[in-house]
């Protein structure tokens, strides 16, 4: 049995110029995930379920667990002295870590994706993304360090808190999965070099918003529902409402996750930096594809910290089909 710590160190030795800083950073995220796992499992007993009295920069009411997870991850990262600053879905601005100007990495994160589901015991997750800063080491980080395209990511991953807690990550050399053993307090390797199945048969989208979708997406949904034995259609519809949980299922079983623009969210709803980029990096490393319907997600130049985007991610052939329908059936 190989632990996450052992696996990370083993991979570090494959790079002659590795300094160990990224290893320490991933270990800090691992610690934060353990703390969140522990408290999610007793959330109903310690009054951290439900909404708080605060709103985030998008005007959304923050869940108590959102704020809790944000603070725990922030503390775990700051304590290691190897991160210059963070950007979080739960923070209005970047958070600069004083005394860490020498650090060369920054972290972007969604501390608890799908947190509105926690009250009903549905899987939730943590998403993280790591970049090398672009401003000089030795100076405080600025917003410029965080507004980098996804193709500049050094590492990305997510933790899914479900029937078991799993951590999945990539450093650009494949996607690897680890399952948390609470009796030992360690994440153990359960799958190395994960890949999307060759064919996907599941589509994940909130069809309750169908009337608000672009024409191309409506046509694609109908395509998924049509019978065609040559393409194994109709596809199965599965939607949890937690990006991490939906993506994880599709990664294992094959499928596509769709969150298009709507009349109320013309730019899309998911955050480019905290959700789309890390999941796109993972998808491509697992042989999949991620797009906003027209453009590769990882090539998009971000303009603001909380920028939103349409998001289609999963099996390559399924994302290709969505892009084709969007091209062929543009909105009037």
Curated annotation (Swiss-Prot):
Known EC number: 3.1.3.11
Binding site for Mg(2+) 2: 110, 113, 275
Protein name per the record: Fructose-1,6-bisphosphatase class 1
Gene assigned in the entry: fbp
Pathway annotation: Carbohydrate biosynthesis; gluconeogenesis
Keyword annotations: Carbohydrate metabolism, Cytoplasm, Hydrolase, Magnesium, Metal-binding
Family: Belongs to the FBPase class 1 family.
Oligomer and partners: Homotetramer.
Top-rank EC class of the record's enzyme: hydrolase
Cofactor note: Binds 2 magnesium ions per subunit.
């Amino acid at each position: 049995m190989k632990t996450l710590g052992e696996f990370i160190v083993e991979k570090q030795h494959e790079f002659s110029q590795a300094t160990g800083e990224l290893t320490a950073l991933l270990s800090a995220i691992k610690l934060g995930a353990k703390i969140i796992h522990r408290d999610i499992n007793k959330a109903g007993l310690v009054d951290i379920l439900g909404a708080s009295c605060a709103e985030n920069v998008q005007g959304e009411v923050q869940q108590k667990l959102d704020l809790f997870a944000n603070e725990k991850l922030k503390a775990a990262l700051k304590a290691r002295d190897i991160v210059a600053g963070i950007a979080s879905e739960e923070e209005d601005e970047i958070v600069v870590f004083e005394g860490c100007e020498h650090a060369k990495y920054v972290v972007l994160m969604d501390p608890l994706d799908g947190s509105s589901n926690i009250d009903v015991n549905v899987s939730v997750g943590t998403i993280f993304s790591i970049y090398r800063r672009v401003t000089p080491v030795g100076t405080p980080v600025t917003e410029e360090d965080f507004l980098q395209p996804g193709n500049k990511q050094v590492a990305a991953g997510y933790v899914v808190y479900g029937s078991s807690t799993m951590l999945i990550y990539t450093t650009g050399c494949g996607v690897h999965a680890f399952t948390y053993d609470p009796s030992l307090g360690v994440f153990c390797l359960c799958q190395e070099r994960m890949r999307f199945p060759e064919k996907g048969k599941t589509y994940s989208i909130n069809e309750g918003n169908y009337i608000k979708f672009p024409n191309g997406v409506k046509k694609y949904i109908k395509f998924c529902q049509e019978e065609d034995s040559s393409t194994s259609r109709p596809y199965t519809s599965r939607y949890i409402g937690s990006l991490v949980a939906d993506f994880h299922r599709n990664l294992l079983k094959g499928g596509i996750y769709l969150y298009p623009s709507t009349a109320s969210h013309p730019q899309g709803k998911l955050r480019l930096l905290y959700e789309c980029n890390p999941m796109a990096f993972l998808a491509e490393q697992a042989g999949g594809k991620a797009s906003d319907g027209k453009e590769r997600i990882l090539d998009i130049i971000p303009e603001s910290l909380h920028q939103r985007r349409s998001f289609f991610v999963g099996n390559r052939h399924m994302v290709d089909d969505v892009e084709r329908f969007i091209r062929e059936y543009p909105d009037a």
